[in-house]
UniProtKB/Swiss-Prot annotation:
NCBIfam families with a match to the protein in the record: ilvD (TIGR00110), PRK12448.1 (NF009103)
Protein name: Dihydroxy-acid dehydratase 2
Gene Ontology terms describing biological process: isoleucine biosynthetic process; L-valine biosynthetic process
Residue(s) carrying N6-carboxylysine: K124
Source organism per UniProt: Cupriavidus pinatubonensis (strain JMP 134 / LMG 1197)
């Protein structure tokens, strides 16, 4: 039987000093025979997705202690990608994922915690904590702060002048601000309305995509990805996480049941998570993160697996930014992630024999939580939790219910396989001479008219140069904007390109241009935006050999992307570039700190999840 890890610092005469310090934190004699549960919070006042988490760690802690455990809370850092976007702050976003993973490892191992509850929410926090969970391999439950309510306003159409009701999110504020057809008053109205409450941004952006994927991985409770942050029902997720983690700890340490450990989910759960992501048209960042999490779990899950799944998994859900009709609150009304997983199971696309933290298997969970099949009225009531439309930064502050569930599987937010938005899913891996190790595109956000696209390269050496050229009308219809030396090494930090793609849309070029980068995209990106080009330019990738005017052909149905230049010419250019060194052709006014330089020394390209190259640490 595995010994409680905490006994390392709480048992035996020689640990009297450590016990004395534990007592100084409030522990009593009886507590030394209980599991010590780390409550890993990520509260910060910088991030709307985390601003309401301050007291929620203690909410979980009280439930842990009521269930017979000892709770010890600590915090991680959290970067807001939206606030860091468009300037050098974005260089720190992806590296923060690894800092979060390391900090959780440091705290949990240093203090010998037996299990943990991870309170996450936004872009790099959930994947960072997932990486730590797999690395540590102790019982864990994830509970997120929840999605923001969608913004809502009435705005005059700049063309028809008719006043229209609009559902909004962060991306609308960016696009409208760059569109001269809208007045300053319009921009101010959208700015004030787009992000009305606490929570992670309201579309299927990276944060919500990752929180939804924790349900598919079996590491969170049903509803974790979709109950809005403001709703009282989310409080029950926090309370149940606190009591359930004590049960899981006892199940492992006292009953030797290793099925409760995060690594036990195995390859099948990673396939389920990616299948869900493809079916719901999630953020391309999830590919980066799942690859990294799988490496921490010691699971051989690769771009080849993602490519294979993308060809056979249907798109069953379409949410902002891929449509302005639905946001995460609408996914919840349609039955949430369990409903999408239920449709995937009926389509024969899901492994149901994987464990979860709340049911013996995913199949058992679906029998209770899939609203199409459940007989539990409490489950149906749960999925009627909706937005209140009241601006607030307070969690659990409203109890609004939708008047009905969205059970329309033909034309609703979630579709059945027979009525899928498309028979192929919302994400695709492309390969070709410009991306030998692959690149990714969110096909859910690409108009059908440009699924096959050939255009002329418009080469830029940074995101800043790309933005300047787009705003100054140097980018024309038919261009493929190349943004290079923005990969994990080249940035460093692999910046998100939400501003360039938003400005392309605001210029009316959303269906007339493509953008290719070795950087990445915000989950809020749509259009023909292709990222994670691997190898990246700084690692000698062919994206660094493209020149202005080169023809580039993109063929999403056939999963190819090529620069239409002969192999001989590419070889000649490579010799030239080897002599010059793989660095931007133009100087960039970019301050790269020692911390970022250290990150760049170890990081690998996006096709490996932008994780550290641990071989460089071998003796």
């Amino acid at each position: 039987m595995p010994a409680y890890r905490s006994k390392t610092s709480t048992a035996g005469r020689n640990m009297a000093g450590a016990r004395s310090l534990w007592r100084a934190t409030g522990m009593k004699d009886d507590d030394f025979n209980k599991p010590i549960i780390a409550v890993v919070n990520s509260f910060t006042q910088f991030v709307p997705g985390h601003v309401h988490l301050k007291d929620l760690g203690q909410l979980v802690a009280r439930e842990i202690e009521a269930a017979g455990g000892v709770a010890k809370e600590f915090n991680t850092i959290a970067v807001d990608d939206g606030i860091a976007m468009g300037h050098d702050g974005m260089l720190y976003s992806l590296p923060s994922r690894d800092i979060i993973a390391d900090s959780v490892e440091y705290m949990v191992n240093a203090h010998c915690a037996d299990a943990m509850v991870c309170i996450s929410n936004c872009d790099k926090i959930t994947p960072g904590m997932l990486m730590a969970a797999m690395r540590l391999n102790i019982p864990v439950i994830f509970v997120s702060g929840g999605p923001m309510e969608a913004g809502k306003t009435r705005l005059a159409n700049p063309v028809t002048k008719a006043v229209e009701f609009k559902k909004l999110d962060l991306v609308d504020a960016m696009v409208i601000a760059a569109d001269p057809a809208y007045s300053d008053a319009d921009v101010a109205e959208v700015e004030r309305s787009a992000c009305p409450t606490c929570g992670s941004c309201s579309g299927m952006f990276t944060a919500n995509s990752m929180n939804c994927l924790t349900e598919a991985l079996g590491l969170s409770l049903p509803g974790n990805g979709t109950v809005v942050a403001t709703h009282a029902d989310r409080e029950q997720l926090f309370k149940r996480a606190g009591s359930r983690i004590v049960e899981l700890a006892r199940q492992y340490y006292e009953q030797e049941d290793a099925r409760v450990l995060p690594r036990s989910v195995g390859f099948k759960a990673f396939e389920n998570a990616m299948t869900l992501d493809i079916a719901m048209g999630g953020s391309t960042n999830t590919i980066l993160h799942l690859l990294a999490i799988a490496q921490e779990a010691g699971i051989d899950f690769s771009m080849n697996d993602i490519d294979r799944l993308s060809r056979v998994v249907p798109q069953l859900c379409k949410v902002a930014p891929n449509t302005n009709k639905y946001h995460i609150e609408d996914v919840h009304r349609a039955g949430g992630i369990m409903a999408i997983l239920g449709e995937l199971e009926r389509a024969g696309k899901l492994h149901t024999d994987v464990p979860t933290v709340h049911a013996p298997s995913l199949g058992d969970a679906l029998n209770q939580w899939d609203i199409v099949r459940t007989k539990d009225e409490a489950v149906r009531h749960f999925y009627m939790a909706g937005p209140a439309g009241i601006p607030t930064q307070v969690a659990f502050s409203q109890n609004t219910r939708w008047p009905s569930l969205d059970l329309d599987r033909a034309e609703g937010c979630i579709r059945s396989y027979e009525h899928a938005f498309s028979k192929e899913g919302g994400l695709a891996v492309l390969r070709g001479n410009i991306a030998l190790d692959g690149c990714v595109v969110k096909t859910a956000g690409v108009d059908e008219s440009i699924l096959v696209f050939e255009g002329s390269a418009h080469v830029t050496e940074s995101q800043d140069e790309a933005v300047e050229n787009i705003l100054n009308d140097k980018v024309k219809a038919g261009d493929v904007v190349i943004v290079r030396y923005e990969g994990p090494k080249g940035g460093p930090g692999m910046q998100e390109m939400l501003y360039p793609t938003s400005y392309i849309k605001s210029k009316g070029l959303g269906k007339a241009c493509a953008l290719l980068t070795d950087g990445r995209f915000s989950g809020g990106t749509s259009g023909l935006s292709i990222g994670h080009c691997s190898p990246e330019a700084a690692a000698g990738g062919a994206i660094g050999l493209v020149r202005d005017g080169d023809k580039i052909r993109i063929d999403i149905p056939n999963r190819t992307i090529d620069v239409l230049v002969s192999d001989e010419e590419l070889a000649r250019r490579r010799e030239e570039q080897n002599a010059k060194g793989w660095k931007p052709a133009k100087a960039r006014p970019r301050k790269v700190s020692a911390a970022l330089k250290a990150y760049a020394k170890l990081v690998m390209s996006a096709d490996k999840g932008a994780v550290r190259d641990l071989s460089l640490l071998d003796d």
